Curated annotation (Swiss-Prot):
The gene is queA. The lineage of its organism: Bacteria, Pseudomonadati, Pseudomonadota, Gammaproteobacteria, Enterobacterales. Belongs to the QueA family. One of its GO terms (molecular function) is S-adenosylmethionine:tRNA ribosyltransferase-isomerase activity. This is S-adenosylmethionine:tRNA ribosyltransferase-isomerase. It comes from Salmonella gallinarum (strain 287/91 / NCTC 13346). Transfers and isomerizes the ribose moiety from AdoMet to the 7-aminomethyl group of 7-deazaguanine (preQ1-tRNA) to give epoxyqueuosine (oQ-tRNA).
Length: 354
C-alpha cells in the first residue's frame, strides 16, 4: 500500500487552533463500520450510542510542558522537545539547533537561561540531556517548559493550554502530546455515562513526539513506527475480559488506547489480553486483525498519517476515506482541538485494501 492512498484535500480553515468553549459540545460524526452509514450529531450523543455494561477505555497520561527554549553556552539558539523523562535528572529529547550539539555541550535553558544542563549522549535522532539542578526533571519542566502544541496549531502556546490540552482525568505525567479524543469528555458527561452503567478503565500510553512525524517512505509496509511506553494493568485486563464475557463492547477512547490494548493482546500468551508494562511499536494499518476493540472514539487525523491508517484498518478503507470526504464537505473541525468520530468495527475491513 502506498502512503498517498491515505491522502485527502483539507482546507487550512478546517484546522482547529482552539478547542470548543465547552469540551463535550464538539460535533460527532458517527460511522457504522459494517455499512459505512454516516450520522451527524454532537459529542453528548454518546450517551445514546453506548449500552449499560459497555466498557470505555481511556488513556490517563498527562501532557508535560515539554518544549524548552535556550541556547548553547557557546551562543547558538536551541529548542528542546522532550521525548521522554528517563529519571529525575535526565531526559531524552529532540534538539533543534543550527548545529547539533556534541556530547559535553553545556545548555542554558528557560526564557531567562537560568537552568543549566549538559548534552551527555546521542541516540540516533535523540539527545540525552542531564540537568545540573537539585529539582526533579518534572519540577523543572513545570517551571520553565512550554506546552508542546502540535506543529499544525500555528500559534504560540498560552497559559490556558496547560489545562485545555489535558484530559480532565489525566493523571500520570509523561506525554508530549495529548490523547486528543479524551479532550471532549467533561465531568458532567463522565457522570452521566457512569449513571447509565457504562464501565470505565484506564490505560497509560505516554504519547511521544514521534506521533507527529510524517511517514517518510512510499510504501507503508516499510515504515518503522516510533516507540512509546504503555501500561495495561491487571484491572484493565479484568474489565476487558468481563465486558467480553457478558456480551458488551470494548470502546477505545482514542488511538493511543487502541494501540495499548492491541499491544497487550498481541503480547498475551494464554488469554485474549494480558497485562503489559513496556514499550510498544505497534503499527496498525489495513490488513491488521483487531483482537480487542469493538468501537472507537477518535478525532480527525492528518492526511497520510499512521492514525488514518489505523482507522482504515478498523472501519475499512473506503468507508474511512468517504467519511473524511464528508467531514470536509460538512466543515468538521480537524486535528487535536477539532471534532470527533464514533466508529463501530467493520469485520470486512481486514480483507480490504486501497
Amino acid at each position: 500500500m502506498r502512503v498517498t492512498d491515505f491522502s485527502f484535500e483539507l482546507p487550512e480553515s478546517l484546522i482547529a487552533h482552539y478547542p470548543q468553549p465547552e469540551r463535550s459540545r464538539c460535533r460527532l460524526l458517527s460511522l457504522e463500520g459494517p455499512t459505512g452509514a454516516l450520522t451527524h450529531g454532537t459529542f453528548t450523543d454518546l450517551l445514546d450510542k453506548l449500552n449499560p455494561g459497555d466498557l470505555l477505555v481511556f488513556n490517563n497520561t498527562r501532557v508535560i510542558p515539554a518544549r524548552l527554549f535556550g541556547r548553547k553556552a557557546s551562543g547558538g539558539k536551541i529548542e528542546v522537545l522532550v521525548e521522554r523523562m528517563l529519571d529525575d535528572k535526565r531526559i531524552l529529547a529532540h534538539i533543534r539547533a543550527s548545529k547539533a550539539p556534541k556530547p559535553g555541550t553545556e545548555l542554558l535553558l528557560g526564557d531567562d537561561e537560568s537552568i543549566h544542563a549538559t548534552m551527555t549522549a546521542r541516540h540516533g535522532a535523540l539527545f540525552e540531556v542531564e540537568f545540573n539542578d537539585p529539582r526533579p526533571v518534572l519540577d523543572i519542566l513545570n517551571a520553565i517548559g512550554h506546552m508542546p502544541l502540535p506543529p499544525y496549531i500555528d500559534r504560540p502556546d498560552e497559559d490556558a493550554d496547560r489545562e485545555l490540552y489535558q484530559t480532565v482525568y489525566s493523571e500520570k505525567p509523561g506525554a508530549v502530546a495529548a490523547p486528543t479524543a479524551g479532550l471532549h469528555f467533561d465531568e458532567p458527561l463522565l457522570a452521566a455515562l457512569r449513571e447509565k452503567g457504562i464501565e470505565m478503565a484506564f490505560v497509560t500510553l505516554h504519547v511521544g513526539a514521534g506521533t507527529f512525524q510524517p511517514v517518510r517512505v512510499d510504501t507503508i509496509e516499510d515504515h518503522i513506527m516510533h516507540s512509546e511506553y504503555a501500561e495495561v494493568p491487571q484491572e484493565v485486563v479484568d474489565a476487558v475480559l468481563a465486558a467480553k464475557a457478558r456480551g458488551n463492547r470494548v470502546i477505545a477512547v482514542g488511538t493511543t488506547s487502541v494501540r495499548s490494548l492491541e499491544s497487550a493482546a498481541q503480547a498475551a500468551k494464554n488469554d485474549l489480553i494480558e497485562p503489559l508494562f513496556g514499550d510498544t511499536q505497534i503499527f496498525i494499518y489495513p490488513g491488521y486483525q483487531y483482537k480487542v476493540i469493538d468501537a472507537l472514539i477518535t478525532n480527525f487525523h492528518l492526511p497520510e498519517s499512521t492514525l488514518i491508517m489505523l482507522v482504515s484498518a478498523f472501519a475499512g478503507y473506503q468507508h474511512t476515506m468517504n467519511a473524511y470526504k464528508t467531514a470536509v464537505e460538512q466543515k468538521y473541525r480537524f486535528f487535536s482541538y477539532g471534532d470527533a468520530m464514533f466508529i463501530t468495527y467493520n469485520p470486512q475491513a481486514i480483507s480490504e485494501r486501497p
